Each structure stands twice: as structure tokens, then as C-alpha cells.
Amino acid sequence: MRVGMAGHRTGGNKGDSMFQLSVVSIAVNDQDKARRFYEEVLGFKTRGEGDRGTQFAWILMSPPSGTAGVTLISPNARQQPGQAQGMMLKTLDIERLHDRLKEKGLEITDIGQASWGRFATFSDPDGNGWVIAVGSLDI
């Protein structure tokens, strides 16, 4: 076995790699409003923030479990609010999560069925699109 970047194993067993997805940046119009949505509706936790009051301000958030997070950033020439689409949150109990999100006032689609599993979609206050899903999505 060899050791690659950041001490991750390389080669060998399926699933070994030199990197993993860490953070996806999402442009939002109002970072404080977006933070409240991600905390209060989705249950995300704030993991860090910086450069407040500048065009480079960011807030790092992540779901209660999992290894990847999202960074709420200010709009810029390359990223505008509402452009991030299809980000997926995997769950083991889609009915329970769907009901909980509806109870919090979130506009969410009915649960649908696809060849890979069951899903529902919603958008954050800036129009960035999310999917909650259960099924054979493991990579």
C-alpha cells in the first residue's frame, strides 16, 4: 500500500483514493438568512466562517453526519444564487425526513420513484436546488 496526499491510501481495495469530496460552494444573496435556513430547516451545523464584511465572506456548514459540507458564499462573476442544482442529501428514512421538512414549512415535492431509488426535491431561499434520496446511490 502507498500513501498519497493527506495520508490517504492509494491503490489496493476498491474505494481507496487520494482524495474525497470535501466542500461545495453555494452562492447566496444573504448569508445570515441562508445560515438560518440551513440550520433551522435542514439541521446543518456551522463549522466555520471568515472574511465577513468582504466580497469573499464565507460560512462553512455541514449536515449532522457525513464528510462533505457546503460553503455559503457571496455572489460573484462565476457563481450566482440559484445556479447550484441537484445537490443530494442521502437519508435512510425518506418519509420521516420529508414529513419533518414539510412541518418546518419547506416547499418540497412529493416523493417520487426512479430506477435508483426514491427522492423529493426542494430549493433553498435563493433557488439552489436540493434532492433528498434513499436508494442505491452509494459510489
Kindly give the residue locations of the regions a language model identified.
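N-terminal beta-strand motif that seeds the catalytic metal site of vicinal oxygen chelate
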Residues: 4-35, 84-87, 133-139
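Short secondary-structure boundary/capping segments
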Residues: 16, 49-51, 60-63, 76-80, ...
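Core segments of cupin and vicinal oxygen chelate
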Residues: 19, 25-67, 103
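Vicinal oxygen chelate
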Residues: 29-32, 64, 80-81, 85-129, ...
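Flexible, glycine-rich phosphate/dinucleotide-binding loops
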Residues: 53-55, 67, 79, 136-139
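Conserved beta-strand in the GNAT
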Residues: 70-73, 130-131
